Amino acid sequence: MPTLTDLSTIRDLCARYDFALSKGFGQNFIINPGICPRIAEAAGIGPGWGALEVGPGIGVLTEQLCKRADKVVSIEVDKRLPPLLEETMAGYDNFKLVLNDVLKVDLKALLAEEFGDKPVAVCANLPYYITSPILMRLLEEKLPIRNITVMVQKEAAQRLCAAPGTRDAGAISYAVAYYAEPKLLFSVQHGSFYPAPKVTSAVIRLDVRKTPAVQVPNGDEAAFFALIRAAFSQRRKTAANAIANGLHLPKAQVLTALQSAGLDERARPEQLTLEEYCALQNALHTK
């Protein structure tokens, strides 16, 4: 079997199948042979496990997953890739390709049908432009997955893994921390890809929590995250100003809620923890 990280192999495959990499799909193939084994190992996949992959490309990471998991299901939106994958994955009978959009496919039904009671890990080299929507769909639907190990743009990785209440945290950091325990594993230089992106990448692992990190008031997650998004919508302002503007509330009401929750009225959005946003949401809705 040809080495899928070899540039000549990639060019030969692309030429024979008349395949041109698509900027629209954010396609950058991995040519560093050491990266994908590290991703697969970091996911903790082994005998008895299932692996769900998003965007297999020509199968570089897929191959490493197939060597470790009982079954690998890869979701691919690019209709041009199945013929290439049929060739590159021909030696693995535990591989299945699903031609669909990961943001539209019924993931709960897919996981139940393909993996049953197996522990499942998600692995992917995610397109930069759609990282957050994919990760949030995987987390928000409370799917039966153990962890998510993905390669993303390093700047996004740092934001995704930033602890709530710290300077680097953004609204997405709070959402990730609510559903999972994130860890930034290692960086990947741009020369590890073909074509080489202009930015550095990084691999992160999200260990999915069995229950969310905090219990939001009335279980209203939509209102809880609307509050956090409003707070971060005007990051340079105080949380009070941003929330009042973002949720169209009187500033006096927000200040009263902050005081009632025992929080600093001058706090910046990133200075509040998940627990403190819960307390604030509760105070805002307590009459």
Go through the PLM ranges and name each one.
Residues 1-222, 226-230, 259, 270, ...:
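Catalytic cores of RNA-modifying enzymes
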Residues 208, 228-287:
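C-terminal lobe and adjacent flexible extensions of AdoMet/dcAdoMet transferase-like proteins
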